Amino acid sequence: LDGGLDFETLALSCSAGCSGCCDRVGAACWSQASPRVVKGRFDSNSYPVPSRGSDGTSDVASLYQRMPPERGRPAPSLESQLAVTLPATAEQSRGTQMQLPALRNSYAQLPERFFAQTGPQPVSEPRLIRFNRPLAEELGLDADQFTSPDGVEMLAGSRFPEGLQPVALAYAGHQFGNFVPQLGDGRALLLGEVVDVNGIRRDIQLKGSGPTRFSRNGDGRAALGPVLREYVVSEAMAALGIPTTRTLAAVLTGDPVHREVRLPGAVLTRVAASHIRIGTFQYFAARHDTEGLKILADYAIERHFPQLSGQARRYRALLDAVVTAQADLVARWMLVGFIHGVMNTDNMAISGETIDYGPCAFMDAYDPGSVFSSIDRVGRYAYANQPRIAKWNLARLAETLLPLMSTDENEAVAEAEEVLRSFQPSYEAVLRRGFRRKLGLLTEAEADLQLAADFLDVLARGEADFTIGFRRLGDDLDASEGQGTARQLFRDPAAFDAWSVRWRERIASETADTATRRATMHAVNPKFIPRNHRIEAMIQAALGGDFTPFDEILRVVSHPFDEQPEMKGYADPPRPDERVLQTFCGT
């Protein structure tokens, strides 16, 4: 916007893949997502870190002077960190024992500056809303233990077994383009880790469990509404096949939280591959703590990308792996019309999972400029801007890794820029493959992406529903030209009819039978998404003590591709009086 682009132009140019404003070095313009990194100096909008020079900037060269990339204390191996068995049975003050499984915490074995240890904070009346038994089974956890009175108290953050090492993680981050050198888990606690049935290590974290050292005068609590929203949306994303954190449980605390009004308090139990964020790396870079950066990077490699451990240029390989994971993730968001709403660098996990469902939303009518977050006043995180912002965030990650990649600054910058340039082709490859399947195209043709783009244009001009539009294409495979249910979405179907002729000609060029094609389309075009008006109605009902809508929508979106005729109302778009125009973080 500071480059003279109005929002409408920016949204359209983002949608078209225009790179006209992407050539500035550093972070001077929030809208650019340059595959370049700051060289020699951190821009004042990028890293307002300690030890500033007279010109108001900070010298990145000092990051190199602190410690060469292959020296300093190495991070202990993940297995060695987990070698200590933590006892899980504790004698409590009321004379009972908490019989709960041991949760080991490898992150708590890192240096103390990585986190803040935090104990339990009692709540008045913890009450289980819902426990995710299928997920517990996947994690190898005993659901009966966690749903026992002792288990519910732990899930509320009210009591912990002896030996548990709950920690709040330190991190920094760019929030709407402005760098904050210390954020951290202000209302979350990492309880520990489990290894699931697939051999994957997963974090168990409480969200809304009370204040920590990073709360910044906040109450550290979560209201019921945002907890239920994250439960439903995260489980919907998992069912859609999109990498995401999961929800193990939701618990009422019995205590109120005060936002604009008095609301019931709740705690969410989040499961994640890890909680390492781009902002975690920024935290150490901002402090010129190259030793901390190296420990963090080595830990991240061993935890998420162990195949990189023996590589000579493993930090470049780490950046490359994160770039690839984020390109894949954001493309998948775009394919289902998901808008994260707050793509700050502290809300991007290096694991490639969707994390931090605050003011998130799914589009109803297709509009590339869709913004729902009440705090996103200029559309920084609009639907069409998401791939651009992801690139911008990854450039900030690359800046933190420069001193680890090479002792030669020019060489490090060149390597980082080369890796960042791979984002766009990786993103576009996933997008092309996804839209081809959404259109029922089983072979590749050069014009397929244009065919998809033209359908999106038809949807936009007709203000037609994104999810229903694609789903009905599969329903209409047997329909005659000029017939079918998809064209009923348009007041004037002429543009759709013209596009449909081209689409049917493309389909006719393939030999697949209709049943196979429809099955392919219905496997990627959901019938159900967690629509914003349904989420809002669910929250309002729960605030009144009725959790039936919560149970219903959770059941529906857990099977998004099934017809579920008895629940067909959940597939309908909102009436004009039901439309949700803004979503809120709840902090």
How should these model regions be labeled?
Residues D2, D6, D23, D43-Y47, ...:
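Intrinsic-disorder-associated, low-complexity terminal segments enriched in Asp/Asn/His/Tyr and depleted
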Residues R94-Y171, F372, R377-T587:
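Regulatory N- and C-terminal appendages and interdomain linkers associated
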Residues S13, D43, P50, G56-S58:
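Periodic, rod-like helical contexts
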Residues P226-V227, P256-H340, S351-Q450:
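ATP-dependent phospho-/nucleotidyl transfer catalytic cores
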Residues E125-L128, P134-F146, G151, A156-G310, ...:
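Conserved ATP-binding subdomain of kinase catalytic cores across diverse folds
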Residues M343:
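Hydrophobic HxD+1 residue recognition
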Residues D346-M348:
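Hydrophobic residue at the +6 position relative to the catalytic HRD Asp in the kinase catalytic loop
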